[in-house]
From Swiss-Prot:
The modification Phosphothreonine is found at residues 63, 141, 165, 170, 172, 199, 217, 225. It comes from Mesocricetus auratus (Golden hamster). Its EC number is 1.2.1.12, 2.6.99.-. The modification S-(2-succinyl)cysteine is found at residues 140, 235. Homotetramer. Interacts with TPPP; the interaction is direct. Interacts (when S-nitrosylated) with SIAH1; leading to nuclear translocation. Interacts with RILPL1/GOSPEL, leading to prevent the interaction between GAPDH and SIAH1 and prevent nuclear translocation. Interacts with CHP1; the interaction increases the binding of CHP1 with microtubules. Associates with microtubules. Interacts with EIF1AD, USP25, PRKCI and WARS1. Interacts with phosphorylated RPL13A; inhibited by oxidatively-modified low-densitity lipoprotein (LDL(ox)). Component of the GAIT complex. NAD(+) binds at residues 1-2, 23, 68, 110, 304. This is Glyceraldehyde-3-phosphate dehydrogenase.
Length: 312
């Protein structure tokens, strides 16, 4: 799913040239159908067709591979330099490194990784070193939380914090109750329940903002909505600040260094208003509250599919 939406984002922005796609599970005609029609984001606004064994999007012919083993994909022959690894399976340096054997020069893992360096755009992307061949783009929740946490920490200091993400359904969940390994709750029907779940998103912020390492943790509630999630960051501030001061610095960041990554709104918004929004995170000024000048609850929305795909 993220692979398809990264492709949509690439054709929408025009910043990236898609030359090849690997999908061993569906044939070319099915690829056309799945790319063209999307239950959440609507029909693709351009043209898409199958022609001469290639997927043709907006007139651009894309080479198709159907390999289960990434070492067999001839990325180099197709002219691919950067590979987006979005299967959710090959997320370690060793496994993702298989793409390099086929001629790719770099691999971006669209998930958290146990050992690959992790980067969040707008937060620690400037630490990227050109010698790195394999990197992780973290998770959608980390890419929402980290820019907000950075702005707050840079201006007021975060002593400690707890994050809750109210998260839309994703493909790992069950349509009806079913077995789910050791995570029994995760196996309950996604459309019927609010499901408490674990997330490493808050702890991962400590990897991209080292000063916050050990200061944040969090959990998730999976809720029966198809897309768009929201982060609640409740934190203690080092430096006292009125809620108006917080709004001011977030707004400034959204118009300056984090423009396009961190959004800001004072409107009376709800989750559907962020469908297909390309920001990593949009601060909801009207939804947050302060207990006092050192203890605040901050709310930020994200399209967990499309916002994340635009950062990839």
């Amino acid at each position: 799913r993220i692979g398809r939406l990264v492709t949509r984002a690439a054709f929408t922005s025009g910043k990236v040239d898609i030359v090849a796609i690997n999908d061993p599970f569906i044939d070319l005609n099915y690829m056309v159908y799945m790319f063209q029609y999307d239950s959440t984001h609507g029909k693709f606004k351009g043209t898409v067709k199958a022609e001469n064994g290639k997927l043709v999007i907006n007139g651009k012919a894309i080479t198709i591979f159907q390999e289960r083993d990434p070492t067999n994909i001839k990325w180099g022959d197709a002219g691919a330099e950067y590979v987006v690894e979005s299967t959710g399976v090959f997320t370690t340096m060793e496994k993702a490194g298989a793409h390099l054997k086929g001629g790719a020069k770099r691999v971006i893992i669209s998930a958290p990784s146990a050992d690959a360096p992790m980067f969040v755009m707008g937060v620690n992307h400037d630490k990227y070193d050109n010698s790195l061949k394999i990197v992780s783009n973290a998770s959608c929740t980390t890419t929402c939380l980290a820019p907000l946490a950075k702005v707050i920490h840079d201006n007021f200091g975060i002593v400690k914090g707890l994050m809750t993400t109210v998260h839309a359904i994703t493909a790992t969940q069950k349509t009806v109750d079913g077995p789910s390994g050791k995570l029994w709750r995760d196996g309950r029907g996604a459309a019927q329940n609010i499901i408490p779940a674990s997330t490493g998103a808050a702890k991962a912020v400590g990897k991209v903002i080292p000063e916050l390492n050990g200061k944040l943790t969090g959990m998730a509630f999976r809720v029966p909505t198809p897309n768009v999630s929201v982060v609640d960051l409740t934190c203690r501030l080092e430096k006292a600040a009125k809620y108006e001061d917080i709004k001011k610095v977030v707004k400034q960041a959204s118009e300056g260094p984090l423009k396009g990554i961190l959004g800001y709104t004072e409107d009376q918004v709800v989750s559907c208003d962020f469908k297909s929004d390309s920001h990593s995170s949009t601060f909801d000024a009207g939804a947050g509250i302060a207990l006092n000048d050192n203890f605040v609850k901050l709310i930020s929305w994200y399209d967990n599919e499309f916002g994340y795909s635009n950062r990839v």
